[in-house]
Amino acid sequence: MADFQDELLALAGIDDSDVASNRKRAHDDLDDVLSSSSDEDNNENVGQDYAEESGGEGNEKSEDEFEEKFKNPYRLEGKFKDEADRAKIMAMTEIERESILFEREEEISKLMERRELAIRLHQQNAQYMAQSTRRSTRDKPLTSAAAGKRDKLTELKKRRQERSARSVSERTRKRSPVSDYEEQNESEKSEEEEGYSPSYAEEKVEQVSKDNASANLYDLNAIRLGRKHVAEYMYHPIFESTVTGCFVRVKIGERDGQGVYRLCQVKGILESRKPYRVDGVLTKVSLECFHGRSKRVFDVNVLSNEPFSDHDFQRWHHQMMEDKLSMPSKNFVQRKLNDLRDMSKYVLSEKEVSDIINRKKELSRVPSNIAAEKTRLRQRRQAAYVAGNAELVKEIDDQLNTLEELSMGSNQNSNSAMDQLAKVNERNRRRNHTEIRLAEQRMNEERRRLSAAATATPMSAPTSVLTGTSPQPSPSLSTSIMSTPKLNPSESVVVASEKASSPDLSPKLLPSESQIFDEGIAVTQTPNTLEDKDFKLHEKAVHGIDDIIATVDFGIDINI
């Protein structure tokens, strides 16, 4: 022990003659240096512990405050306020329900982002205060004596390292290269660890483990793409590279009147065979999606705008475990979230805007005469079919399907107007049918009334107005009138009661005035009194005019 202390004093520049006299003083100096350094370390550790303790208490307190301040207003399933709100939303149509839930999802996402930013800002402030405390402890001004002692100790450490390095170099000549490599790595690791405090190393390990942790339901909803998002950005120049790796909620069918959805990950963008419309936008974009190891291509119009439910996430997680696939990490989710933000903030150049417009025009281009174009394509298809060219037939079929889609989109407004006109025509036809039925009922009632009046009135021969006598009717009256009626558009026999009940329904097949006179039937003028009307009705009933009216074709053209 004495030899080691002498060596230390010799390294410090003290002669051998002064060793005995100055040994006590050297011991005191060395003890002072070690004690001063230990005191500084203790002070630094005390400051660090105090900062960590205060920071930890502050973090717990701040998290509680932030949890209360940024409280999610939709506590029920993360989408509804309460049971009444849930019943109200579920009673809406699917479009209205998805729109409201999409708005609530964005509201919750913004609220969570504000909460995370507030927590991070508070943590950064706490770390800054802790670093300031440690820095103030280290930067405490030293006295000249303490500074000299520290310089001597530094010099001693340097010389010891040089001597140990020489001894190591001598020993390494007899050792293997593998052991040298391991020792070098260990020394490098030890040197690197000396430059970092244990607390920082623990924070670094904790951060790495947190980044490599599996993503949860909240993380996947952060990088979920809805139908509205895809329809808005599907012509964007960096759309394909951005959405690859994101997640979508796909509707695959219905069960018991409810939609069945699957959580899928987008692996690529494909082009569909024919264009289709998504929220009024014409496109040919299709998504290649994976659910576990199952792969399928979906059109954009089957995507849902609602967030993933817990059932969707659990089923997808079970499928990933069953297929022995690794879950995406939180670090991956953060990268995709940054990509989505970059795409939303991307500024398009003039050339990119022109390309987007040209792509939309190319899809929405409609021929001037769609019918003629379809006829021409069908003729080409028939010729290709006869020639046995299956590829050309398939190509022409795709063109015909495209024309059908375009014609449906271009004629949407006109078809709507035609539908309205068809409804008006149908309403008019029903009204005309009702009016005709009522007119027939009135005629039947009038006929029954006239028949009843004819049976109740005594049989008396009418007197002719022209001759004042009662002419005898010819036996062949009914036969001649009913068998060979002649039309006279200017003059006809009109019954006053029928004219009053149905003025628009005038019979066409009535005997002419000359024919009636030739057969000996007296024709009176239009009666002016009620007695004349009754007399004429009685005369018509007696002479069989009812039979004539029953055989008359009114000739009314009504479109039903």
Swiss-Prot record:
Sequence ranges of Low complexity compositional bias = 451-480
In terms of Pfam families, this protein maps to:
Plus-3 (PF03126)
Composition bias type Acidic residues, residue spans: 180-195
Q: List the disulfide bonds.
A: none
- What's an example GO BP annotation here? transcription elongation by RNA polymerase II
Q: Which GO terms describe its molecular function?
A: bubble DNA binding; RNA binding; RNA polymerase II C-terminal domain phosphoserine binding; single-stranded DNA binding
* Compositionally biased region (Basic and acidic residues): 148-171, 440-449
Where is this chain primarily localised? nucleus
The name of this protein is: RNA polymerase-associated protein C651.09c
Starting at the broadest rank, the lineage of the source organism is: Eukaryota, Fungi, Dikarya, Ascomycota, Taphrinomycotina
